[in-house]
């Protein structure tokens, strides 16, 4: 599963882990993404989205219909 949110576009970020002795090694911070199913009443079917927890709050605030319209306007297939 890809660690990219379909609503916000959040991706993993990269940086350095710094130990107590200040030795630096590469690491990545993954966003908290979940696979969630949402029901689209206009189409009468459910869709599965990979969304971050912030994306879930956006869906709760704006509604699934408007969020799906924005995703489709970007050219992403759902």
Curated annotation (Swiss-Prot):
InterPro entries: Ribosomal_bL28 (IPR026569), Ribosomal_bL28/bL31-like_sf (IPR034704), Ribosomal_bL28_bact-type (IPR001383), Ribosomal_bL28_sf (IPR037147). GO terms for cellular component: ribonucleoprotein complex; ribosome. Gene3D superfamilies: Ribosomal protein L28/L24 (2.30.170.40). GO terms for molecular function: structural constituent of ribosome. One of its GO terms (biological process) is translation. Keywords: Ribonucleoprotein, Ribosomal protein. Belongs to the bacterial ribosomal protein bL28 family. This is Large ribosomal subunit protein bL28. The lineage of its organism: Bacteria, Bacillati, Actinomycetota, Actinomycetes, Mycobacteriales.
């Amino acid at each position: 599963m890809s660690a990219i949110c379909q609503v916000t576009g959040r991706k993993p970020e990269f940086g350095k882990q710094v130990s107590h002795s200040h030795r630096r090694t590469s690491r990545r911070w993954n966003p908290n993404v979940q696979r969630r199913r949402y029901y689209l009443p206009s189409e009468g079917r459910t869709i599965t989205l990979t969304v971050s927890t912030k994306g879930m709050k956006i869906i709760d605030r704006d509604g699934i219909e408007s969020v799906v319209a924005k995703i489709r306007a970007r050219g992403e297939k759902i």
